[in-house]
Every structure is written in structure tokens, then in C-alpha cells.
Amino acid sequence: MTTLTITVGPYTYTARMEEADAPATCAAFAKLLPYKQKIIHARWSGEACWIPLGEFNLNVGYENHTSHPAPGEILFYPGGFSETEILFPYGATLFASRMGQLAGNHFATIFELSLIHI
């Protein structure tokens, strides 16, 4: 099991890469490590934060995709209808943009859910 250490402000989380269910996304994202971006609160998706990535292309298609991630299920949206992004849900979330409902690749899961701060 490959793990990630994720730091958001003063908080640090440990997540497992979902390599069995999203192998292409995990492999492509792993090549970017260490990864650093700004995270902002989501506008359309509910209780989530997101990392807008514009036209960035990770060269992956859809795999293990969902519109309804549980808290801690991190999604990568490969772009198409809306800009590329990473979604970091911490509560009730329906992944969407101003274009409507989206689906993203669930590629990592925070497994210390009690540590997610709302």
C-alpha cells in the first residue's frame, strides 16, 4: 500500500493510494510527487475543497470515478467539461461545476477520518 502525507494549512493527513482501482491515475500522480498547490473551498460541490488546475493534462481517462465521494475520498477530474481539478471532500459532496454534475477518479483515501477538520 502506497501512502501519501497531505498537509493542508496546519493539518496533516495520511491517505492510501487506490492503486488497484485507479492504477493509471495513481501512477501518473505519483510521478508528480512531491506535489504542492493552493487549495480553496469548493463553490458548487458542497462540503469540499478543490485545487483548480486549469488545462493541466495528467493523460488519464476515467477510472474508479464517482460524483458522490465520501469524506476523505480524494478525486482527480481529468478535465473536459470543466477545468482539470483535484477535489478534497470533507462532508456531504456532490461533485459539480457551473457546467453541472461531474465525475472524478477516486485515487486516494484519507484513512484517519476522525482527523478531518470541518
Which stretches of residues belong to each language-model region?
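A generic structural signal for residues embedded in beta-strands
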Residues: F76-Y77
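Short, basic/aromatic beta-hairpin or loop at an interaction surface
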Residues: H41-F56, R98-G100
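Conserved small/polar residues in nucleotide/adenosyl-binding loops
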Residues: I116-I118
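Start-of-domain signal
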Residues: M1-I39
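Loop/turn positions that initiate beta-strands
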Residues: G72-E73
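Short alpha-helix capping/helix-loop boundary micro-motifs
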Residues: N59-N64
